[in-house]
Amino acid sequence: GTQIGETVPAGEYQPTDRTHPRYENFPLCRFGAGSPERCFADSNTAWARYKELADQYNEPGVLTTFAAYEYSPVMESGGAEHRNVLFNGEDLPDHAISSLDVGSAVELWQGLENTCDIDKGCDFLTIPHNMNKGWGIFYSRWTMDGKPYSSEDWQLRQKREPIAEVYQIKGSSECALGLGATDEECGFSQVMEPCKEGETKGCAFNTSFARQGLKVGLQLEQELGFNPMRFGMVGSTDTHNGNAGDAEEWDFVDKAGAATSPAIRRLTLVRGDKPYDNNLKFHTSGGMAAVWAEENTRDSIFTAMQRREVYATSGPRINLRFFAGWGFDEGIAESVDAIAVATAGGVPMGGVLTPDKSAQKLDQKSEERSPTFFVWAGADPMDAPLQRIQLIKGWVDDHGKTHETVRDIACSD
């Protein structure tokens, strides 16, 4: 494997030995406001208030709220390995573990495992966030502090990270042209150019994008016997404005209030800024997270996220169902109970399609038969019509190299 300090091809993540500040050495307080320990303890009071607010506004069947926060270790040149931490249940931790406590995702998962006790009714998951500005770390084989993942680390990631954010106000993290993808749609909402030789920051890495992450998972499955990168995809706004789901382009209010401005300013580059640093021009209106849950409650939605029955959009409220099976007939599309048929004969989005039992009975290999898919999509009535439905296939060849192909399976007139 690659060692720290070795030269790697352009767009490949270079493991780096980073040292992160701990709260004891960080100027959390204003002068005269007390010791860092005092300010650190005060943060628990704020976290307790957020937990109370989540419970106060949670109304099963009407509005579901979760206690959650953003874990935000920073990297050089504005990069970050951010993750959203979302809790469910009772007896949640008294302290929100931050990047001043732990410097890597592995340490975060370990800390949360120790403080969120499933036996006491507490559960959690983490969601990779703003991956396109992670300088390749999210789907690399290395942690933030330059250490390789162990098998135990991968198992922890598999358990605690079932979904990933692929679209938000700072662009798309699904795929990028020139980074293992030839799909023209991968040029959508890109804010950085692919890395050139010698670049280690401020550019797009192949392991910053979800499609490559899924393919890395296939490689790891061959090596480890399990796939720690089996995840569903969601979108989000990341505006920090408190207006969840407000992703309309025609009513764009930008990020965090301070960046809001007239269109003429947003479309003007700031002299000397790199494109990805120009917050005004290179913001989208944000994305949406969709979850197929049995009911609008914490337990139902959280369980659906754990089983990865989720999808992302770049803002429109598109309806989407997707199933995989071994024997779907074309007539399913005309069936009045198509979803029930697909559910009975296959697995939904995020599921795992097991080997074909009928092929085993006939003493055939599952590889000799191809899986079948059922997909149904409906446009947002307040947005543009749907143009096409595509199926993207990723695989690993006999030499361990990853590939992907894109096929149109339905197109508009």
Annotate each language-model stretch with its function.
Residues 1-142:
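A metal-dependent hydrolase metal-coordination microenvironment
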Residues 39, 51-54, 69-76, 116-124, ...:
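C-terminal functional module detector
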